[in-house]
Amino acid sequence: MHDNITSYLTYLPSMAATAWYHKKAGQGKTLEAFVEEARNFTYNTYAPALYKGSLLSASEQNSIAEKLSYFIGLDKAYILRSNNRILMHRFQKNLLADKGLAIGRLDGRFMGDEADDVSEGPNLGDPSSYQIEAAYTAALNHYFAETLNVEMDRPYMTSGQIGGKWRWKPVPDGQYWEPMPVNTAGQLGETMRRNTEMKVLVASGYYD
């Protein structure tokens, strides 16, 4: 259990899209319509429910679990045992548990055949990373060398290889910081106001 409520809210529409793709939820509806339905539930029902926490009645908890099951394709009883909070690695492991497969985190359409079917999360890593990482890294290095003429005296490390050691605190060491979801919007906004020519690309797919 972790207490970053924001993560449960931001992940839910992508979980719904991924469940739709794997035919575990939303069948008979278009992807766009189903994801929009999930977003509306997230904004109007799920967010207030998470903030109510233990003040929710048993009936309300049951209703939320039922809707979550509808959107993300997991068993309602499992969702209730999870206190209506599904951690991403558990979703990756459980959505296709009946097939012994884990799904990707970077891209939920990818699947990996798992040897350990009862682990809490994918035990081989992220299927969408280990299935594309070699090709992605090779293409990126080729682009750097042949198109950008960048000369490197050491191997280029992809983000997946170093991400686990990333320092997430947005303030210098020793400065007070109240733990919270990572939010760099303030710093980014300040930088863009100082540099009015700066352009920012935000890219995220339905299944990311």
Q: What spans do the regions from the language model cover?
A:
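Loop/turn elements at helix/coil->beta-strand transitions in domains of secreted/extracellular proteins
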Residues: 196-199
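Short beta-strand/loop motif that positions the catalytic acidic residue
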Residues: 202-204
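Extracytoplasmic/secreted envelope proteins and their assembly/folding machinery
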Residues: 65, 185-188
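Catalytic cores of eukaryotic secretory-pathway lumenal/extracellular enzymes that build
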Residues: 2-27, 152-184, 191-194
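Alpha/beta-hydrolase
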Residues: 1-128
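Small-residue-rich helix-loop
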Residues: 99-179
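Acidic catalytic loop of the alpha/beta-hydrolase fold
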Residues: 207-208
